[in-house]
Design a protein with these regions (language model features):
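Electrostatic cytochrome c docking/interface patches
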Residues: 24-47, 62-70
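Axial heme c-ligation environment in periplasmic c-type cytochrome domains
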Residues: 63, 86-122
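Bacterial signal peptide processing site
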Residues: 19-23
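Short, cysteine/histidine-rich loop/knuckle motifs that typically chelate Zn2+
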Residues: 18, 54, 96
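The canonical Cys-X-X-Cys-His
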Residues: 48-58, 111, 115
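Short sequence/structural segments immediately N-terminal
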Residues: 43-49, 117-122
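Sec-dependent bacterial lipoprotein signal peptides
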Residues: 1-18
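Gly/Gly-Pro-rich "capping" loops immediately C-terminal to redox-active cysteine motifs
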Residues: 57-85
Length: 122
């Protein structure tokens, strides 16, 4: 039969890796704009800065960026309860409870809502 060369396998694997969700997580805003976005509620803004900002406001982290509708839409289609469950259990590079052990389910819903909305909806 056919012998597949290791170099060909490696090239195929690299091509597929370029199609991963994190590779399509291109920011719609500049880094400065992403870093400036905060929830209007001061308490929630503090939680966001402490638990979410590092990954969700920095391109290349693999996390859906704040305001990146294309990245958030498939996640939102799972429903809020499923998203909150994923946050609480951890997913991929996100640790359980998303570095917010004191967050309530309502806090997670508010944070998801903030991060998944376009900037003009804030």
């Amino acid at each position: 039969m056919f012998e597949v060369r290791p170099a060909l396998l490696l090239a195929g694997a690299l091509a597929l890796a370029g199609c991963s969700p994190s590779a399509t997580n291109a920011p719609a805003r500049s880094a400065a704009e992403l870093e400036a976005l905060r929830p209007a509620d001061a308490r929630l803004a503090g939680v966001y800065e402490r638990a979410c900002f590092l990954c969700h406001a920095r391109a290349g982290s693999g996390a859906p960026l704040v305001g990146d509708i294309a990245a958030w839409t498939p996640r939102l289609s799972k429903g809020t309860d499923a998203l909150v469950a994923q946050v609480k259990q951890g997913l991929g590079g996100m640790p359980p409870r998303g570095l917010c052990p004191d967050c309530s389910d309502a806090d997670f819903v508010d944070l998801i809502t903030f991060m998944s909305q376009p900037g003009d909806k804030r």
